[in-house]
Amino acid sequence: AASDVYKRQKERFDKDNFIKNLLLDNLLLVDIYNRAKKLHIEVEARRLVFILETNPDKNSGALESVKSLLGTKSGDFITAVDEKNIIIVKELAPGEDYAQMNKVAATILEAAGRDEEGKTHVAYGTIVKEIKEVSRSYKEARMAMDVGKIFSAENDIYAYSSLGIGRLIYQLPIPLCKMFIKEIFGNKSPDDFDEETLTTINKFFENSLNVSETSRQLYIHRNTLVYRLDKLQKSTGLDLRVFEDAITFKIALMVVQYMKYMETLDY
């Protein structure tokens, strides 16, 4: 019996090790198939990778909670790569698609326990059909986590397949971003605008550049809004009532968000 327990533990350790190396692209193609066969891991199953990022102070419990939630399914693998991130490689049942995966993401979030500081997020990649593609789904989930935290910080679930324009901005080299911002704003940065101006701009975008609706929601007179937009046009040369200028401004704000996020990362 003791040897059985040892065997089971060794197999679990070997599987965990295999999945970690698979995610990090540390295996040759031939090794992937040989080791998967030895460990009785299905090579042609549909899978998707989730990343759960939690508050390190709460993480010890999160891993166990997620394991007890999903760990009963033999095709799913759950592993922690560092003190903040838990990786779930989920095997999909026939007919399961992204709508179900979004529900799984919500369940994972519940299991981990939402924290008030907003440091708990789940991101996931795309569905892959072969074991060798799992690392791609993992990279996509990683990117979704970054892009989501930069551009949709108010949400806590990020799907790689719906990152929108943020995905494009995230791939831009920082020097190019700086050049773009300088070209549009000169030595100013959109950050330099006061809170009132930024609130006005964001509300105006939310309401599809509709002056009446924006002024109503901001509880200000229409003329006050027009005055603010005129003032903005004077200082930037961009008239947000003109679609093309509005797009330029919106992208510039997103580029600045991205640059700020990259600065906060510990290099």
Question: Which residues does each PLM region occupy?
Answer:
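Short, small-residue-biased leader/transition segments that mark boundaries at the very start
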Residues: 1-6
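Cytosolic nucleotide-utilizing catalytic cores of signal-transduction proteins
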Residues: 29-49, 53-267
